[in-house]
Amino acid sequence: LEVGTGSGYNAALLSQLVRRVVSLEIVPELAARARNLLRCGGFDNVEVILADGSLGWPSASPYDAIVVTAGAPVIPATLKEQLRPGGRLVIPVGDLALQQLIVVQRTEEGFQTETHGGCRFVPLQGKYGWQ
């Protein structure tokens, strides 16, 4: 699962590594443009969905991996819960100026979290984003 389709570039890269990519975009114009670009590029294993990515996409869960390409104020529990055991969530978390890149792995016992340094992403929009 990718949260934040944007231009579709990351979804195109991910599509070369995995069988199927579900990518969520909250901005209608970006979703339509990315959908068109990906189709024209022959990336048939990418599905772009207009949705609030901070909620994830439960109907296609559980996921092996979730990549969030926008900075969040907190890690949305909704995304963690959609991970398969052994799955990983990569998400930038912090304030609007600076985030830390967080990797969450779901285990049989719960969740393990690692922090991997500073980064800066556009703000996550939606219910669990910056609104």
List each model region and its residues.
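Conserved histidine-centered catalytic loops in small-molecule metabolism enzymes
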Residues: T113-G126
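Conserved nucleotide-cofactor-binding alpha/beta core module
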Residues: L1-Q112
